[in-house]
Amino acid sequence: MKNYILLLLLAGQTAVAAAQDGDSRSLYLTRSLANDAITSAVVRTSAGGIVVSGQAGQAPRVEVYIKGNNGNELSKEEIKKRLDKDYTLDISVTGHEVKAIAKSKRQSFFNWRSSLSISFRIYVPQQCSTDLETSGGGIGLDNLKGNEKFSTSGGGLQIDRLNGVIRGNTSGGGIYVSNSGDDISLETSGGGIEAKNCNGKIRLETSGGGITLENLKGTINAETSGGGVNGNNITGELITSTSGGSIDLKRMAASVSAETSGGGLYAQMLKVGKYLKLQSSAGNVDIELPQNQGYDLDLRGEGVSPSSVAKFNGQWEKERVNGKYNGGGIPVKAEASGGSVNIKFR
């Protein structure tokens, strides 16, 4: 599973790296923002990447990286010639907002051999909001606090140390988010998602890759329609589903709702929150529960294992269990319509 997700992420992260490589050979110009006290950044480009960083110790500035669209290095004279003919490149500051805009002058298709890849790397104060769009490159953000909105139609998203309202989407690359929090919503229509060391309200969605969740705290909603879900060390509430892979959850201390229609489901609970609901229509459901909590059990499958447990009062049959464990309390529902339910108390 991890190798599969890594492969899905590589294309997106490689695209982000194109704007992050710091290759001085493609650095076309630098515009200082030292005297502008920037609090907002708006960036638009096509066939290029965008990076916005609030990293301490960096002088506020805009860097523009330009290459031939086939990756070839070009002289500044050749770049200027192509820019003047086919593009508009504008960097401006109004109030405390910087705008960096690169766009074609032509509405219709023109010779790709003469087209350019225009990427931006922008250093700003940490307290900065963003509005970023690119049609073909990756987007990277780090060390920012504010409202962050960003989208790309073909590259990856790489996010680290953001706090605020975070809204991002890509239509073909992977997503990696770490050390971030408050209110996160990220979506991709073709790559994997990996989220680590995040907190708050988190929504993650992909329509074609796997999801990895690690060291998360808060209310997490993670959905995929084509890969598996791996979760480790989650506190709070997790709602997750997949229509094409298995679900593997370890070291959970949360309320959990997990559903798969394409594989098995494993849930290791260190502590059950307000509820536990597990469902698989194509495999087994395996559960480990702490024995010091009380549960109202509702288990159904082609078989239920073991055949009985201590401290249980109710109906325990071969394919159905309904009753109270340890005096009852937290509702625990598990259903395996294509396999067995296997439960352990530890």
Model-derived segments and spans:
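Intrinsically disordered, low-complexity terminal regions
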Residues: M1-R346
